[in-house]
Amino acid sequence: MTLPVVAIVGRPNVGKSTLVNRLTGERVAIVHDQPGVTRDRTYRPSFWQDRDFLVVDTGGLVFADDTEFLPLIRQQVVTALSEARVAILVVDGQQGITAADEEIAQWLRQQSLPVLVAVNKCESPQQGLAQGAEFWELGLGEPFPISAIHGNGTGELLDQVVSYLPPTDQQAGEEDIINVAIVGRPNVGKSSLLNAVVGEQRAIVSPISGTTRDAIDTLVERDGQRYRLIDTAGIRKQKNVDYGPEFFGINRAFKAIQRAEVVLLVLDALDGVTEQDQKLAGRIVDEGCACVIVVNKWDAVEKDSYTIYDYQHQVEQRLNFIGWSDHIFISAATGQRVEKIFERVHLAAEQHRRRVSTSVINEVLEDAVGWHSPPASRQGRQGKIYYGTQVSSQPPTIALFVNDPALFKDNYRKYIEGQFRKQLGFRGTPIRLLWRGKKVREAERKGVLVRDR
């Protein structure tokens, strides 16, 4: 990552994620009154006084608990601090200093970076000074009374933060970044895949379903191309999800699909294609994203020379409505074929952004109509395609101007889409055909009437 990092740390439920949302101007980190909601490192861009930087939210630090996740969370915090230029220790001004705050402060004093103390939940500026004064005892310098919810005092805190940051370098534009969402059912190996791709334990990996709750962004670069990888909460059937942090994480996962240009749909090779996989694929189609189907845990499958073909057939049968997607069989645990994912993602993004000239589109249409004319209606009306033109990309969208859209039934529309794919490719991306009525004389005036051969 090229931008400087500001790490947010503290014990559970002091308002770290609320502060991240305040500093970055968007509600991305999950906020809930259940302690320990944030487990992984989540990065978000921020800007203050001509400085661009990333704010990293971390899990709540607890030193005196044997819960399985806590050693993993501590490792995530250590990694975040190793990346950071400055850390913000968030404490609760209403509760005052706790033993946990003192323990964390002692640990932070051993780290080789500046630490600022943000005394949160100081809703009154007058009382905030008194609430903040107590935290001088932590030995980390002047406390900053703030209200993450209302924004009080955050400007002064940011002024001090940016004093530790270098001037902003010229950054490549957002249009150069390919957004890639990693989605799938719980425990199919999404976080393991992210870690294998990045080369570090970026997201917490655990055999317990639902470990990842936030959508987590990681910027990586391969062969000169930058990718933003978004690891998401596993998506289960709605009836199995309580209206707590996991519910919000699933909503975040759906929003991650909306943000993405390419989606990696991760399947578990041991489970095959499930009903929930089909629903996820349907969401990807609805959002118009490019897609690469990643079959994980391939190393655990007993194989013969036909296994991969049988599995591909199953994928094509059960996910036939997303049959244009590319497939790759990997093992995130062993790293098998993981590096080839970037090649597939790059090709899918290229096709997703692709534009085709009007002349080429009409050559395809002329051939298609010549091979298979539009069927006539029961009343004898013949469907006619006058011309087509691409009106947008991401995904490629082609408007077809016809005499009456009602004359073109689903099977013929699928035939036309198939001809575009056969002659032009579009592997890895959906294409959308817009059937529009147009009078014959208008088409003839343009001189682009598609005729039967």
UniProtKB/Swiss-Prot annotation:
Quick one: which residues bind GTP 1?
A: 10-17, 57-61, 120-123
Q: What does this protein do?
A: GTPase that plays an essential role in the late steps of ribosome biogenesis.
Which residue intervals define the domain KH-like in the entry? 354-439
Q: Which SMART domains match?
A: AAA
Among NCBIfam families, the record links this protein to: GTPase_EngA, small_GTP
Record: residues binding GTP 2: 184-191, 231-235, 296-299
Instruction: Indicate the segments annotated as coiled coil, or none if absent.
Output: none
Domain (EngA-type G): give its ranges: 4-169, 178-353
Question: Which Pfam family, an example, fits this chain?
Answer: KH_dom-like
Give the family from UniProt.
Answer: Belongs to the TRAFAC class TrmE-Era-EngA-EngB-Septin-like GTPase superfamily. EngA (Der) GTPase family.
Q: Name one GO biological process term.
A: ribosome biogenesis
> What name has this protein been given in UniProt?
GTPase Der
